[in-house]
Amino acid sequence: MKFVSVEQAIKDLQAGKMLVMVDAEDRENEGDLIFPAQFSTQEKVNFMIKEARGVVCVALDETLAKKFELPLMVPKNTSNHETAFTITVDAKDATTGVSAYERNMTIQIFADDNAKASDFVRPGHINPLIAKKGGVLERTGHTEGTVDLCKLAGLKGACVICEIVKDNGDMARREDLEIFCQKHDLNMIAVSDLIEYRLKHESLIKLEEKSQSVLAGFKAEKFIFSDHNQTQHIAFCFKDIKKCENVKFHISGSDFELLTSDKFSKLLEQIKFLSENGGVIVFMQGEKSSTTQYKNYGIGAQILRYFGIEEIKLLSQSCDKDYIGLEGFGLNLKACNFN
């Protein structure tokens, strides 16, 4: 079974149909049953609970999350993929909030222009999720993918999503998802196709400055980029970048932490390697989590695309965990190692 185009997926959502969205094989490799919150019905919610069997959530853009005063569930997110769960909610007029009827009642509030935060009680039985502002170009998750797709369809930035679980309780994978879609006459879309679609029409980065520079004693060309959050990221290029495949991503954290660990000497080794063999090191501004290896390199991937890089050899020893969904950005990961 083939994935449908983004254009077809948009038409399906506009018609109020349900879809299955699949993320990357190197991420969760799972599928979510989705539909726009504004087209929610008791029947759809019941189908989701009965057939998909996962946790019913509502993916929201930041604007709606702020409107409904939904704080994150925990101040420090230590989950594998850093999904931005907020506190749970129920409709104020619900009783237990568990039934498909009352969950639908809760979901419809998210799509109501006149609704307000006080229309919810907390905690509840619907799990709101906050999508990153940059969508799939910032984070390659179901949360961002579903909100992006709703917005591309001209709908509100609120989408009902639920993981698809098999009869035996295991998570449904690609082959299982194809069977599920055929059984229920549903189309399936890939997050990677959505990334590719958005990249053809927009970008989250802008080149602010370009100059000759020196990094750790080695001559390099310096590029300063700003993203959609006005955060700056810096790339240092060695030799002819278009002919190079060697890439290093570095999350800029505490200078003190770097200088007092063995990471500093390793970083210097990598910079020396790049200066001798050619390549690029991208310093990404952001908080580096010590509790999870998962990072979202959407911005970094766009910087590489700016340089025309398509095939990369990453200077890293943990590609299986750290670099998720790069293929959606048109990047072919050829190798990943640095001893």
Curated annotation (Swiss-Prot):
Cited InterPro entries: DHBP_synth_RibB-like_a/b_dom, DHBP_synthase_RibB, GTP_cyclohydro_II, RibA-like_sf
UniProt: Mg(2+) 2 binding residues: E28, H142
Residue numbers marked as site, Essential for catalytic activity: H125, E163
Cellular component GO terms, alphabetical: cytosol
Pathway info: Cofactor biosynthesis; riboflavin biosynthesis; 2-hydroxy-3-oxobutyl phosphate from D-ribulose 5-phosphate: step 1/1
Cofactor(s) required, per the database record: Mg(2+); Mn(2+)
Keywords: Lyase, Magnesium, Manganese, Metal-binding, Riboflavin biosynthesis
Top-level taxon: Bacteria
The protein's Enzyme Commission number: 4.1.99.12
Lyase keyword on record: yes
Catalytic activities: D-ribulose 5-phosphate = (2S)-2-hydroxy-3-oxobutyl phosphate + formate + H(+)
Pfam families the record matches: DHBP_synthase, GTP_cyclohydro2
Gene3D superfamilies membership: DHBP synthase (3.90.870.10), GTP cyclohydrolase II (3.40.50.10990)
Binding site for Mg(2+) 1: E28
NCBIfam families in the record: PRK09314.1 (NF006804), ribB (TIGR00506)
Similarity comment: family membership: In the N-terminal section; belongs to the DHBP synthase family.
Record-given protein name: 3,4-dihydroxy-2-butanone 4-phosphate synthase
Source species of the chain: Campylobacter jejuni subsp. jejuni serotype O:2 (strain ATCC 700819 / NCTC 11168)
Higher taxonomy: Bacteria, Pseudomonadati, Campylobacterota, Epsilonproteobacteria, Campylobacterales
